[in-house]
């Protein structure tokens, strides 16, 4: 959503192509004008508040008339929700279509990664059963990196990068209760993420997260939402599964992992709640988690502190640095934002466990 700007005066003329406007040092297009009014939109990030106008003469022979308003206005940016890319047809259907932002579509996008490691800033997305696709924010193009068939996946699921961004790990919901099939695949940036290799074999799972302090990949399996990690086996010269702890005591359930950017702890989302597992720097291992926000099995939309708050289906989340925490000298400077999937909203959780709704409105 953009903010309208109307400028009133005299002798503006009736040709908007001859009127040039900058707001806060950023150029905006003159949408319309008459002799007494100019209509345009506030451009993005125009926070300085100074407005400059340049009007060319009707015949183009005289020097432009330039004017800068003495009075500055204070523009307060409002958070809004919009569509970056993708659309549906008249019946509300869509499918995976590559192309520019105007024509690209998504069939079943579920997981999202911000790729800040490459030369160009991109988003990496996939949905259950793929494909993995790249959204290039600079060229404004969408391309397919790998389909499920190309990677021999049973059911593509969660993704994460390693600490360098050179390796992309992908969970595979292959549906088996044995360790005969690949659970985590890895894709390399050097190959443009177009070849999937086996990283570790295990039972079916849904999520993975990388611990930067120990350079270890953690992931979940279905049974009790158990957290496993991949460790090197000198006998096989490969990675094998090692159980760390179960998330749930008495249920088999999906669990999704997000490791703190500094490796201090790990959030585990699922079953209507958020668990927190602290990292022990002496043992170099995550500890058995405790309930941090929401309540296991209690589905609702309630903004409230800690376990008195409620989630419908807490799904993928990400840590976001809060500059106010940094200025205040707090030990943890990150808020946690997650998608409350069936609640149709984005929730925010502070380091103290305060739950609020950031965008959308919860529906149960």
Please annotate each region the language model reported.
Residues 1-82, 191-192:
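Ser/Thr/Pro-rich low-complexity tracts
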Residues 74-108, 140-157, 174-175, 191-204, ...:
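Gly/Pro-rich loop segments of beta-rich domains
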Residues 76, 135, 185-190, 210, ...:
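Hydrophobic/aromatic beta-strand positions that recur at structurally equivalent sites within the blades
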Residues 114-120, 161-165, 210-214, 259-263, ...:
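Residue-level detector of Asp-centered blade-edge/turn motifs that repeat once per structural unit
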Residues 123-126, 169-171, 218-220, 267-269, ...:
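Residue position within the beta-strands of beta-propeller blades
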Residues 128-129, 173-174, 223, 270-272, ...:
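Residue-level signature of beta-propeller blades and closely related beta-rich strand-turn architectures
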Residues 130-134, 180-186, 225-229, 272-275, ...:
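A short loop-to-beta-strand structural motif that recurs across blades of beta-propeller domains
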């Amino acid at each position: 959503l953009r903010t309208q700007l109307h400028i009133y005066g005299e002798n503006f003329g009736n040709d908007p192509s001859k009127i040039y406007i900058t707001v806060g040092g950023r150029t905006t297009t003159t949408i319309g004008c008459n002799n007494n009014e100019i209509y345009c939109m506030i451009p993005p990030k125009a926070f300085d508040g100074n407005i400059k106008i340049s009007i060319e003469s009707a015949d183009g022979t005289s020097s432009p008339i330039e004017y800068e308003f003495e009075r500055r206005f204070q523009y307060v940016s409002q958070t809004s929700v919009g569509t970056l890319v993708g659309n549906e047809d008249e019946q509300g259907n869509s499918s995976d279509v590559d192309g520019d932002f105007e024509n690209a579509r998504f069939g079943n996008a579920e997981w999202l990664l911000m790729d800040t490691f490459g030369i160009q800033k991109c988003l990496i997305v996939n949905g259950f059963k793929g494909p993995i696709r790249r959204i290039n924010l600079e060229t404004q193009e969408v391309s397919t990196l790998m389909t499920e068939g190309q990677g021999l996946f049973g059911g593509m699921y969660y993704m994460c990068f390693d600490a360098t961004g050179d390796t992309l790990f992908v969970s595979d919901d292959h549906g088996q209760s044995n360790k005969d099939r690949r659970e985590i695949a890895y894709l390399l940036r050097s190959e443009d993420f177009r070849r999937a290799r086996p990283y570790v074999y295990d039972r079916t799972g849904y999520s993975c997260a990388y611990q930067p302090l120990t350079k270890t990949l953690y992931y979940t399996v279905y049974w009790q939402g158990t957290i496993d990690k991949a460790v090197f086996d000198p006998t096989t010269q490969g990675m094998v599964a090692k159980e760390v702890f179960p998330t749930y005591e008495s249920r088999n359930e999906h669990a999704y992992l997000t490791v703190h950017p500094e490796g201090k702890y790990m959030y585990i989302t699922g079953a209507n709640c958020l668990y927190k597992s602290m990292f022990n720097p002496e043992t170099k291992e995550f500890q058995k988690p405790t309930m941090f926000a929401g309540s296991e099995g209690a589905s609702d939309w309630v903004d409230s502190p800690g376990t008195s708050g409620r989630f419908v289906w807490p799904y993928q989340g990400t840590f976001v640095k809060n500059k106010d925490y940094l200025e205040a000298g707090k030990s943890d400077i990150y808020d946690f934002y997650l998608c409350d999937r069936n609640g149709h909203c984005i929730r925010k959780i502070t380091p103290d466990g305060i739950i609020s709704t950031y965008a959308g409105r919860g529906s149960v």
